[in-house]
C-alpha cells in the first residue's frame, strides 16, 4: 500500500564486492521508475550504497540488526537527494530472544538528531502487535505479510493511542531481552562503526541458499 517504491535486491554472497553490487544495482535501477536497490548492511554493501547515492540511485539497506549498522547507513548515504530506507528485521531478533522492536525504537531515537534522509522500514513483521508498535514508534514504512494484514483488517484497523504499551514476548510468553540504546555520533565516518552481526551473515547465507534452490527448481 502507498507509493514507497519497489525494492529490488542484488545478488550477494559473503565474498561479493561493492563494485559487483553496484553494477547489478545500476542495471536494476533502470527496470522500473520507482526502484529501490537493496544492499546488505555489510562493509561492501555500505560501499555500494555510498557509490549509488552519488549516482542518484535510490537504496534500501537490508538485513539491519544493530544500531551501529543504522548509524553507518546514515553516514554512508549523507547527502542523498532521495530518501534512503533502512530495514531493521524485528522478527529475526525476536527469534533469538531479543526484543526486535527495541532496535526500531533505538534507531528512531538516534535519527531524531539527524537530517531525516534515512527512513525506517520495519521488516520481518510477524504480528499485529509488531505492526502497531511500528506505527507507535513512527516507522515511516513496514513490510507486512498478508496474514498480519488480514488479522489487522479483521480487528477493524486499530491504531495505537498515546497510552499504547508494547510488551515483547516470545511464542511461550517469555519476556524478550531488551536491546539497550547507544549514544552514537552520526558525524563519524561510516567505516568507524562495527557492522558485524551474526544475523546479517546468516541472512546472506539464507538468501544464497534460497536463490540456488530456485535455480535448481527452474532448471
Q: What is the predicted function of each stretch?
A:
Residues 176-219:
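C-terminal extensions of enzymes
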Residues 1, 29-32, 108-111, 115, ...:
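Structural signal for hydrophobic packing residues in well-ordered secondary-structure cores
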Residues 43-46, 50, 60-179:
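Catalytic alpha/beta core domains of metabolic enzymes, predominantly
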Residues 1-54, 58:
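Active-site beta->alpha loop and helix N-cap motifs at the rims of alpha/beta catalytic domains
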Residues 23-26, 50, 105, 109, ...:
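Solvent-exposed alpha-helical segments within well-ordered globular domains of core cellular machineries
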Residues 37, 134, 207:
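A residue-level signal for conserved active-site and pocket-lining positions in enzyme catalytic cores
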Residues 18, 22, 101, 128, ...:
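Electropositive phosphate-/nucleotide-binding environments in soluble metabolic enzymes
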